[in-house]
Amino acid sequence: MSPVLEPAREYPSLDTFRLSELEAVRLVLRGGSVIDWHRLNFESREEAYGLLRAQEFDLSDSDDLERIEKIKQDAIAYLRRNFDFPVPKPVANADICDLLMMASGRGHRQLCACTILKVMHIIHHLEARELLFMLPTSDQEVFHMVEQKVYRVVGWMLSSGFPIVEFIGGRKNKDSLYTKLLAKQKNIAAQIYDKLRFRVITRSSDDIFPTLAYLMRHVFPFNYVIPGESKNNILSFRRFCESHEHLRTLLPRLQIAEDIERDSMPDDNTFTSGNYRVVHFVVDM
């Protein structure tokens, strides 16, 4: 795990929202998958490094660098072995930040870099899940590490005066898990993702985008969002963006079809009140 760093006290502004941040927020709200993306939209190496930091990679740590390089080489080998996928030498030899920047560029190298990163994402995820089963580490220990990270970052947000009016965190008790399984059509315990949950209430709906962007910088990376598990019945992504001058200019540059959002998503939990308004998403950490 990377060293504990003090989160930035600068709160993201809608007036300076970057395209990469808007893409990430959109992904969270609709429960999309980065595998469906065609490109990244990082404008600087610092942005690229920020994604790595959110995944607990420390580029000053030789072990982390070795781990990243191993994942990259495994991804390239997979593509060559199964698809005879040509990877130019400059792409194959690029460090991880350069690879992320290539995926944000244009041309054949962009396509290659993006494809490699998608496979790296899958390999890293699968190997992490395997490691979780192999190591003598209990869920409680993992939960404790996640809680420490979340409480530390949200603590900085609260002390810095960010527009959060309420924060609640905790682990679901067994009764809550029983009820959730009873309410689900697919009542298998392995499909309960959100055993550790946090609730953040912002001052207004205008604060949702900046708060999500900040959390994705410091708590969880956008590519860890579980596809199909998001629910958003607070705001319409498109209408919200169209109502804000700067965000409106970014809309034509989004990479997924414009009509993919829904104004509201049905909630499969029959125990939830129809008046309950929430942006709900699940992250696999």
Regions flagged by a language model, labelled:
Residues 188-190, 194-197, 201-285:
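Long beta-strand-rich cores associated with HINT superfamily self-processing modules
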